From Swiss-Prot:
Belongs to the chaperonin (HSP60) family. Keywords: ATP-binding, Chaperone, Cytoplasm, Isomerase, Nucleotide-binding. GO terms for molecular function: ATP binding; ATP-dependent protein folding chaperone; isomerase activity; unfolded protein binding. GO terms for biological process: protein refolding. The keyword Nucleotide-binding applies. Gene3D superfamilies: GroEL, GroEL-like equatorial domain, TCP-1-like chaperonin intermediate domain. HAMAP family: CH60. This is Chaperonin GroEL. Its main location: cytoplasm. It catalyses: ATP + H2O + a folded polypeptide = ADP + phosphate + an unfolded polypeptide. Together with its co-chaperonin GroES, plays an essential role in assisting protein folding. The GroEL-GroES system forms a nano-cage that allows encapsulation of the non-native substrate proteins and provides a physical environment optimized to promote and accelerate protein folding. It comes from Neisseria gonorrhoeae (strain NCCP11945). ATP binds at residues 30-33, 51, 87-91, 415, 495.
Amino acid sequence: MAAKDVQFGNEVRQKMVNGVNILANAVRVTLGPKGRNVVVDRAFGGPHITKDGVTVAKEIELKDKFENMGAQMVKEVASKTNDVAGDGTTTATVLAQSIVAEGMKYVTAGMNPTDLKRGIDKAVAALVEELKNIAKPCDTSKEIAQVGSISANSDEQVGAIIAEAMEKVGKEGVITVEDGKSLENELDVVEGMQFDRGYLSPYFINDAEKQIAGLDNPFVLLFDKKISNIRDLLPVLEQVAKASRPLLIIAEDVEGEALATLVVNNIRGVLKTVAVKAPGFGDRRKAMLQDIAILTGGVVISEEVGLSLEKATLDDLGQAKRIEIGKENTTVIDGFGDAAQIEARVAEIRQQIETATSDYDKEKLQERVAKLAGGVAVIKVGAATEVEMKEKKDRVEDALHATRAAVEEGVVAGGGVALLRARAALENLHTGNADQDAGVQIVLRAVESPLRQIVANAGGEPSVVVNKVLEGKGNYGYNAGSGEYGDMIGMGVLDPAKVTRSALQHAASIAGLMLTTDCMIAEIPEEKPAVPDMGGMGGMGGMM
């Protein structure tokens, strides 16, 4: 085991803060409508230009082990916020840097770090509650477009295309982002259902470029058990072969001889088939198979209801216009199911959502509604160069996450104003402990930092703007994009409440851990001995 470098106290904390500052200073320049670009060198291809905080954070690795630990902890803030809300990574980083900087002053002055952390936690809990109170629902297409635009660095075209996608596939539908072929952004909407299971063998692929198996006008066989014996399948395969159409088999599993025979038939061109595992587990799998059956107009072949694989006919099989099977996902497009039956099924699942007790069950049921009722929308990002395409795609993905978050928990005034207004909840928050009260003060000051940074990036004077915004009430704030003061929601500067909440909670969580750190341990790199020079080889003195 390699030797370790163990360091204690203020000295090591300062190194950690240095790491935090290096990473945060690189990320914070991207904040706001006038945020600057960061150019990242890549080992392959051209440099990557981005305004996405988490992309910048992920690229940073520092030489000093202790500074690097600080940087990695703040990177965690950005990543966690990105995972939960899909946006707000830069805001979270700016908040974390501010809480750490303020907190370190108090720790160095001799205050109890644990009490400071408790104070910070109490302040954040009060702010989160206040944010919930001031959030307003985000229902209209116009509001969705505004949220999308703000998240895509004030690109109105991106906001509009996301709002259109949500309108077409429903707020619960599947929306994906892909590289486009033209200079303009395009929206492609496909009515269909997507589930997270891919082909069981790469030999099923028939589109090498996209790495998918595409089936046009296929039959769909749904079976709730494993298929390992090809004899069980033969009667159905013969009927499908006579109809000269491809077949998708969705079963608990397809293995052994059955899978091998399907692959061989596919390679030889005898019968175009693809096998995938059924999505979900246990009772949820049965329910999802039933969903697919209703969508495609087929029947789930199950021994529980007296149906067997050997006696299955073409009438038992579902059908669709097209099915695309990738490595991890299968998309059923234009199933032949009866619209009335699909609606009845959706209504039935919505009923289950109302009676479900656990959040997990509700989430899974919600997903099933999305897959049945919605469709699949593909936003194709257009750009002149590959470098611009990557940058634009980052922003579109951010905007998509932000709009989903807005629909979920509502919106608040953007541009850092919501956090300033939520401060009102801290004015009268007294913990009865001087050190904890100091923790509350840390958060009170830190919530100004996002607005200060937005103004600084726009070339304004942060203190002047913050004071003027604090003099106002409600949604009154500063629009850095246009340089005007006014009603932020009226001007279309909105942030999803979920993004602001997640940024604050994750920033405070990691910053609190940093303040209570008193020892850091890093590995001492082993010094590799230099390779000695090769001495003159004997007996070769006469050679020039």
